[in-house]
Each structure stands twice: as structure tokens, then as C-alpha cells.
Design a protein with these regions (language model features):
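Short intrinsically disordered, low-complexity coil segments enriched in acidic
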Residues: 1-4, 62, 97
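Hydrophobic membrane-insertion alpha-helices, especially the h-region
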Residues: 1-17
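N-terminal start-of-chain detector that recognizes signal peptides
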Residues: 7-11, 22-26, 43-46, 94-99, ...
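Aromatic-capped interface at the extracytoplasmic side
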Residues: 14-32
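Sequence context surrounding c-type heme c attachment/ligation sites in exported
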Residues: 22, 31-82, 123-160
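A generic structural signal for short, solvent-exposed coil/turn residues
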Residues: 28-30, 43, 105, 117
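Primarily the internal scaffold of c-type cytochrome electron-transfer domains
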Residues: 70, 79-123
Length: 160
């Protein structure tokens, strides 16, 4: 019985160490090239858009949603019209950088964004549990509102 407890305890410690050194947990500086160059510095910084405008599930779901292209279309949709006949805004509609957004809006195919802050599949983390208790986005993600290109600035190890 004691031996079983030692083995289980050792397995738990091993799993914790594995998570603590897993590349996606400690990947400080991770800065993938996204399919659309998106400036959080402009959107969250200069324009003062709340994180939840795009990441709208962060306070009620386990995961902070990567926004659907329709969210981009609210401002960058151009001549497109929604199902309820609302015309979408036309901010920077001629920009070549937004071609994938326009294409996605027209075809209804998602943009393949690359997660910057990504935990291993075996780790359960609930964003809403932290956000609803007052943990700010900045605490884990850094000053994203000052980043032209988002990068991971802290380890995601929770420092146990």
C-alpha cells in the first residue's frame, strides 16, 4: 500500500515536471506569423477595443475564443451585407493585408489563426474561472495592447 502511494506520488510529480518544462508551456518569445497581420497595438491599444470584443467567450467558457471572421467583418466587411440586411463597415476594405478576411467572409471558410498562448492538450485550464475572479489578461499575456505582433512573454506554468 505504501509502495502504491509512492508510485502514484512519483507519477504525479513526474507529470507536474513534464508540464512545467513542456515546450508550449515555457515557450517565451513564441511569435508565430499569422495568416493576417493583426495589430493588437492598434486595435486594443490605440482604438481601446476591449479584449472581450474579439475573445468574447473568455469570461464564460473554458477557452478564450479565437474570433470568427465575422467579428473582423463588423469593421472590415466592406460591401458585404449580413443576413439581417445590415451593411458591414468598410474600414480599410482595399487593403491587400485584409484579402484573407474578405475571402473568408465571402466563402465562410475560417482563417487558420495560430495560437500564441497554447497549452498542451493534456492540460485543463479554464479562462472563465480566472477572468471572473479578477485575474486580468495582462497578468498572463503581458501588455498585448502594446504589441504590434503578439508574442508569449510569460511561461504558462502557473509557477507551482
Amino acid at each position: 500500500m505504501v509502495m502504491g502511494g509512492l508510485l502514484a506520488g512519483g507519477g504525479y510529480v513526474g507529470a507536474c515536471l513534464f508540464v512545467a518544462v513542456h515546450p508550449t508551456t515555457v515557450n517565451v518569445g513564441h511569435r508565430p506569423i499569422q495568416p493576417v497581420p493583426f495589430s493588437h497595438k492598434i486595435h486594443a491599444g490605440q482604438l481601446k477595443l476591449d479584449c472581450r470584443y474579439c475573445h468574447n467567450t473568455v469570461d464564460r467558457a473554458a477557452h478564450a475564443a479565437i474570433p470568427p471572421t465575422a467579428t473582423c467583418g463588423n469593421c472590415h466587411g466592406g460591401n458585404l451585407v449580413t443576413e439581417d440586411k445590415r451593411a458591414l463597415s468598410n474600414i480599410h476594405i482595399a487593403s491587400k493585408k485584409l484579402e484573407p478576411v474578405r475571402s473568408s467572409l465571402e466563402t465562410d471558410e475560417s482563417i487558420d489563426w495560430i495560437r500564441v498562448h497554447d497549452l498542451p492538450d493534456f492540460v485543463y485550464f479554464n479562462h472563465s474561472a480566472h477572468v471572473t475572479r479578477g485575474v486580468s489578461c495582462v497578468h498572463c499575456h503581458g501588455r498585448v495592447d502594446q504589441m504590434e505582433v503578439v508574442s508569449q512573454v510569460h511561461t504558462l506554468s502557473m509557477k507551482f
